């Protein structure tokens, strides 16, 4: 996946996240909606991590295409 594709995916996920939150403003999310929101957040973390990996590899003179999506449990533990 190229940088522009990752950025587009990030934008789509952020829009989904905001739509879900806005549609329930002042209301509690159902268990299904909480799960959906959690999956969106996890996927966002993976996308940001992949984009950072690609940029770091490029800056170091390495092939950005060798960057790989890391498991959710790994990227969720990173400090932002």
Which residues are covered by each model-predicted region?
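Extended, charge-rich alpha-helical interface modules
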Residues: 1-80
């Amino acid at each position: 996946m190229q940088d522009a594709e990752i950025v587009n995916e990030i934008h789509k996920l952020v829009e989904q996240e905001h739509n879900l939150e806005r549609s329930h403003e002042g209301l509690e999310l159902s268990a299904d909606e909480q799960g959906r929101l959690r999956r969106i957040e996890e996927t966002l973390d993976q996308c940001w991590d992949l984009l950072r990996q690609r940029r770091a590899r490029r800056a170091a003179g390495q092939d950005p295409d060798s960057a790989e999506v890391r498991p959710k449990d790994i990227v969720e533990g990173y400090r932002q």
